[in-house]
């Protein structure tokens, strides 16, 4: 796995210069993309295959540090733009139609956008947002064949097919005919195109007023928790074991804190803020000791030491009119789809105390097959695989303000069951601090703040427990598995359990929007995608994603997403997409080839053939790659050593003399506290890691220089690594980065020997062999690649993969 040189000083410089307007250049930003090498295993051929190949692609390409922001003065859209204008509607539609290959309906889709433009001009973007949002909801329910519930806020006229009238009849007719013939999957590309175009409402420039009522409104349910016996049974069914204590991990964030622009650098003021709510000092001690034992006591003593040292200077500063530090504040994030999310920014010391708990709960979620936190696709695939009833309905429920309204008392009981020392009450007390907001200081009345460590993780874990309790109430005695969860998103494939789930949620005071919930035997909505049986997988891109890809090389990220989901076939890639690209892209043939090779390898080799224990297109390159690789490695080592030294010098000269706090403490006070501040040790730790990484890289260079015969380099690992580079995300208008990328690819082409124009034949080769089992190929002459042995299922090596005798002719 690649590691990046740790350089916190660059962000330190950026924030310091932003506040004090200091002139001068930034410190050198070292971003060596290296691999940590275990020197004891360097002679092990199998162990070094992936290590050396990571080195080839990371060092030669060096693309991970590429920014996708456009700094030019062109009229093209910037990547960080979130809102659309009417002038961009037609281009958006044409791009979506091109990606989904629905050119026969392009005129119909242009009519939709024409009507949207008219509504914008006459009623404004706010009304258009509400209208398209309702059109989207009604369209999804109509495709799912659910009874339509008209909204009371906005009226949308329906046509004879019971689709919104804004959708032209030819599109409706095609979808309905396939639905009646029970082949709705045949309209997959058409539905994707339709929903993507309707999803343009998510990026309309709307004016949203933040709603704080979900935070301060009193509890409206019947009970704030569930019976302890049921909770213990549910947690036992989830195979969660009790924990005595956790290992404390010190962390620091470079994001904004409640008292400064960089949370890591304001730990002294964050410690001082505890005097505004003195009872939280003892609550912090209680939580730390219960979770971390003696190390928790040391953490509390560390915080108290800083508090007591800064207290005299703080009192003087407050008397002179300085701002009083705060424990936390509420920030508003204006998200897409007309949402204003209220995010809590809490104390850095509280975040440090919660960090290990945060990691532990996420570890528990990773072991639950029905959770989609780490893989959004997997839980629904397992649900379809394990589902026995072919006509079973999918209950996709939409929760309203789940984080704010899910009772924290229930989460406290779950924490007390998981941990032997019962830290739940002190955890709740630390989350219920007073948060500064435009409406004054607020405290969460029912739920917990979104944005604090452990917040989302506890929401997801509690959601799993609620489903298991609903299954127990339905008569299940074993673990219930016919569901999937992603945070507050849930799909249940059982009638009785779904009914009990609704009762539980009503008891707990959570509201479920029936109008937004998708309940159907055809498909449902999960993780912003429509999913169902028979590989029915409808995903719709937002405007921001489409325009983002339009600036990137060839839109191939979007195209390969369509490929991966079965919307189009691999053999259509060149005739339907690449050959129809504008002429401006012809100059990037080598980029095209590498993007195609990387993604097709990921699709074909990554999924189906590997499932059969076969590894295609795998050969070892010879020793001729070693000299150029050594030169590249040595150049990178020298560059990163210089960058690391420049960063250290900048830190010593300027890094610790600029205040980052907002409450008015004198700069010399912070300088006096440097030896005991967490930020000092975190920065030193990062520099030590950087030094260690570079030392290991130099050791690898030395061993490769004098023991090159111990290495075997597999081409498959190179191509696998290419799927993680930034080539598909490259902004083609950034000429410097395009030129640098092309130069690196030419170097890599000399090593890997994939000539320009060979990607089409590469696809044909993979597709031809990927359909055969066992695979038998006598000879493949194209592109100078020769197969020495037939591809069979005999002679398996390293975890069931066939080592093929490929080599460069």
Curated annotation (Swiss-Prot):
It is an enzyme of class 2 (transferase). This is RNA-directed RNA polymerase. GO terms for cellular component: host cell mitochondrion; ribonucleoprotein complex. It is found in: Host mitochondrion. Forms a ribonucleoprotein complex with the viral RNA. Since the viral RNA is not encapsidated, ribonucleoprotein complex formation appears to be the strategy to survive in the host as persistent virus. RNA-directed RNA polymerase that replicates the viral (+) and (-) genome. Keywords: Host mitochondrion, Nucleotidyltransferase, Ribonucleoprotein, RNA-binding, RNA-directed RNA polymerase, Transferase, Viral RNA replication. Its main location: host cell. Its EC number is 2.7.7.48. PANTHER family: MITOVIRUS RNA-DEPENDENT RNA POLYMERASE (PTHR34456), REVERSE TRANSCRIPTASE DOMAIN-CONTAINING PROTEIN (PTHR34456:SF13). One of its GO terms (molecular function) is RNA-directed RNA polymerase activity. It catalyses: RNA(n) + a ribonucleoside 5'-triphosphate = RNA(n+1) + diphosphate.
């Amino acid at each position: 796995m690649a590691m990046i040189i740790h350089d916190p000083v660059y962000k330190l410089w950026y924030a310091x210069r932003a506040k004090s307007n200091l002139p001068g250049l930034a410190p050198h930003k070292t971003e060596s993309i290296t691999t940590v090498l275990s020197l004891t295993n360097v002679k092990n051929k199998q162990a070094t295959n992936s290590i050396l190949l990571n080195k080839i692609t990371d060092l030669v390409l060096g693309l991970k540090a590429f920014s996708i922001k456009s700094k030019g003065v062109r009229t093209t859209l910037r990547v960080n733009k979130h809102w659309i204008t009417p002038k961009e509607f037609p281009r958006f539609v044409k791009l979506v139609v091109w990606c989904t290959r629905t050119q026969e309906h392009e005129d119909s889709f242009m009519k939709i956008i024409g009507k949207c433009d008219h509504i914008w001009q006459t009623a404004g973007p706010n009304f258009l947002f509400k209208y398209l949002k309702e059109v989207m909801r009604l369209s999804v329910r109509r495709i799912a064949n659910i009874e339509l519930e008209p909204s009371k806020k906005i009226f949308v006229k329906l046509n004879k097919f019971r689709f919104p009238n804004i959708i032209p009849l030819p599109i409706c007719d095609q979808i309905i005919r396939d639905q009646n013939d029970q082949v709705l999957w045949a309209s997959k590309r058409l539905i994707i195109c339709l929903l993507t175009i309707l999803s343009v409402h998510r990026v309309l420039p709307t004016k949203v007023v933040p709603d704080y009522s979900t935070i301060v409104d009193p509890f409206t349910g019947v009970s704030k928790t569930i019976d302890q016996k049921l909770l213990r049974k549910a947690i036992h069914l989830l195979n969660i074991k009790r924990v005595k204590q956790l290992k404390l991990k010190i962390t620091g964030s470079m994001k904004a804190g409640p008292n400064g622009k960089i949370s890591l650098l304001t730990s002294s003021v964050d410690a001082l803020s505890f005097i505004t709510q003195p009872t939280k000092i003892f609550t912090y001690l209680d939580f730390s000791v219960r979770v971390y034992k003696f190390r928790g006591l040391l953490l509390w003593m560390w915080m108290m030491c800083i508090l007591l040292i800064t207290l005299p200077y703080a009192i003087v500063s407050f008397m002179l009119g300085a701002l009083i530090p705060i424990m936390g504040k509420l920030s508003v994030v204006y998200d897409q789809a007309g949402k204003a999310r209220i995010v809590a920014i809490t104390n850095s010391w509280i975040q440090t105390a919660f960090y290990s708990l945060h990691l532990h709960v996420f570890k528990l979620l990773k072991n639950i097959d029905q959770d989609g936190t780490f893989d959004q696709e997997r839980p629904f695939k397992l649900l379809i695989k394990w589902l026995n009833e072919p006509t079973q309905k999918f209950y996709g429920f939409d929760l309203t303000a789940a984080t704010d309204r899910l009772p924290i008392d229930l989460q406290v009981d779950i924490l007390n069951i998981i941990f032997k020392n019962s830290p739940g009450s002190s955890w709740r007390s630390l989350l219920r601090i007073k948060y500064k907001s435009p409406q004054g200081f607020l405290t969460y009345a029912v739920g917990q703040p979104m944005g604090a460590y452990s917040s989302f993780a506890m929401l997801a874990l509690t959601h799993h427990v609620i489903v298991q309790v609903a299954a127990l109430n339905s008569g299940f005695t074993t673990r219930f598995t016919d569901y999937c969860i992603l945070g507050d998103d849930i799909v249940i494939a059982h009638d009785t359990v779904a009914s009990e789930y609704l009762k539980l949620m009503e008891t707990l005071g959570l509201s479920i929007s029936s109008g937004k919930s998708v309940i159907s035997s055809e498909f449902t909505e999960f993780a912003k995608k429509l999913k169902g049986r028979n590989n029915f997988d409808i995903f719709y891109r937002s405007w921001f994603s489409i325009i983002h890809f339009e600036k990137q090389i060839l839109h191939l990220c979007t195209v390969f997403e369509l490929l991966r989901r079965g919307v189009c076939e691999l053999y259509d890639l060149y005739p339907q997409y690449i050959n129809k690209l504008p002429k401006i892209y012809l100059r990037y043939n080598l980029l095209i080839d590498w993007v195609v090779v990387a993604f097709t390898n990921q699709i074909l080799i990554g999924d189906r053939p590997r499932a059969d224990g076969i590894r295609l297109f795998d050969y070892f390159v010879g020793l001729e790659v070693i000299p150029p690789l050594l030169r590249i490695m040595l150049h990178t080592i020298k560059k990163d050593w210089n960058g690391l030294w420049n960063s250290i010098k900048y830190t010593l000269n300027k890094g610790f003399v600029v205040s980052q706090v907002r409450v008015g403490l004198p700069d010399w006070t912070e300088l006096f506290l440097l030896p005991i501040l967490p930020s000092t040790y975190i920065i030193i730790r990062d520099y030590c890691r950087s030094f260690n990484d570079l030392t290991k890289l130099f050791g690898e260079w030395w061993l490769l220089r004098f023991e090159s015969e111990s290495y075997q380099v597999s081409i498959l690992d190179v191509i696998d690594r290419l799927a993680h580079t930034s080539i598909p995300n490259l902004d083609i208008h950034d000429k410097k980065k395009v030129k640098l990328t092309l130069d690196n690819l030419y170097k890599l082409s000399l090593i890997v020997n994939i000539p320009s124009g060979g990607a089409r034949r590469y696809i044909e080769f993979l597709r031809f062999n990927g359909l055969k089992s066992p695979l038998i190929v006598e000879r493949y002459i194209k592109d100078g690649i020769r197969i020495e042995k037939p591809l069979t299922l005999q002679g398996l090596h390293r975890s069931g993969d066939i080592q093929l005798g490929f080599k460069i002719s």
